[in-house]
Amino acid sequence: MGKIHILKNADEKTLKKVVSDIKIDSETVDKIINNNTRIEFNENDDYIFIIFYLPEYVKATKTIDSLEVNILYHLKTNDAFIFTNNSYYFFDKYKSKIDEIDHKGFGSFIERFISVVIDDESKMVEHILSDTNEIRKNYFVGVDNYKLIKDLTSSQINISTLTLITSNQNKLLNLIESYTTTKQQTTLNYKKTYLTEELQYAKEFCTTVMKSIDTKYQVKSAEDLHRFTKFSFVVFIATYFVGLITLLYTDNSRGNIFFFGAIATSVLSLLGVLIFFRSKN
């Protein structure tokens, strides 16, 4: 039975010391040390090398980031070396669980390791659904639309990020299929299908809540526009009568009776306009 070694932020010197018994080429060393952009699966007589990506939730920003993981599996000793840089929590949280993986070959190791990853992804979906449900509750109690839309947009972005990462993982599952038994394949396919369905449900749930908020926002905007139109009309009438008053006062210097009459007329007119619009509400 092989051992599992987790190495975080390993430099080239440490890397070469750790894998001194493995005939590892310089190109693979460079890939482990540097950042890569896509999933990769390579095999030779000595080892299997995998570039793999998993999601990590960043509490500070409430976002999901993609974490690159490099796996070097020694075929002669069945030792697995897991290299990762800048991990927020995954390998600290699941170290004991990964250390306990009982494997006699690459197939059993990779099936159990990916199962740990998928289980963590399922927990992320549960958190997203919980957050979205909280947003839904806040929507019904009248929380500010801007905050609701901001929080909901964050959930939608996290769902999209998680969907993209898991889609890439599915490519790896296809590549390792020939190394796993039928039972191991069934286990991974079940977990993968369940996660895909949960992600789809979370996406639809977020979309439904967003549409409800948008509808409410559009209705409120229409009401605000209606109020603004009424207010503008009242201001227009008031401005008109003020201009009329000024004209009368200027032209009628012989007395103030016309001036006060104009004031009374404008006030009554404004009251009439206000009463009219109030009766229309």
What residues fall within each predicted segment?
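A generic membrane alpha-helix/interface feature
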Residues: 41-43, 88, 221, 250, ...
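Membrane-associated alpha-helical segments
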Residues: 143-248
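Alpha-helical transmembrane segments
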Residues: 121, 195, 214, 269-277
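Peripheral, non-transmembrane regulatory/ligand-interaction domains of membrane transport proteins
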Residues: 1-178, 279-280
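Alpha-helical transmembrane anchor segments
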Residues: 231-281
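Generic intrinsically disordered, low-complexity segments enriched for polar/acidic and small residues
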Residues: 2, 46, 198, 214, ...
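A sequence-composition feature that detects small, non-aromatic residues
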Residues: 10, 60, 80, 202, ...
